[in-house]
Amino acid sequence: LGKMGIPAHAISRTGYFSTQEIQVLLNYLAILDNPRQDIPLASVLTSWFGGLGEEELGYLRAVDKEKPFYENVLAWMSESEEISESISEELRQKLPEEIQEKLARFHQTYQKLRKKSRYLPIHELLYEIFAMTGYLDYVTALPAGGQRRANVEMLIEKAIAFENSSYRGLFHFIRYIEKLQKYDVDFGEAEIVSENDEAVRIMSIHKSKGLEFPICFVA
């Protein structure tokens, strides 16, 4: 329908956590809490945040195959604002300069955000991520950008609701999301179509009970 220029919206109670824009954002939050995680770290580095391609990621992995992937990355992400002086010249020569520059840019933003993550409420941390990386503008510019943006903004709402409970902090929020995923407690994607919008609404027969439509296709 989208390819034909027909506005359409699928109503679902699942699929929120599997959307790319949310997966990447949750992975970024995860490594802000703890960067020693190979899969979330690789996901973030090959996303808008890191800008690395798969081949470049392979170069980074090959720097020292005896160590976990995250250790190779952390060698370039010391607590200082500059790239760690402990990196040997041999390691520098193994990694192309373009990759080093991308890691340096990623490292600079990451370190600032990680410091903020220690005291900011989650929803404010998300706003900081968007302001410093342009992530919200990026997802909005993608195909189906309106839906993607609404999904990201929905995560802010979830963060605010979480902070109104008895728990606080990034660590607890990540554990909360992980528990939802573990027990298959998912959300549908954010609603961006109102009842008065002219668009095709895709839903189950059960969901359509009690509603009236001038035209209906059953498939």
Predicted regions and their residues:
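Accessory alpha-helical DNA-binding modules that contact the DNA backbone or grooves
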Residues: V63-E90, L103-F106
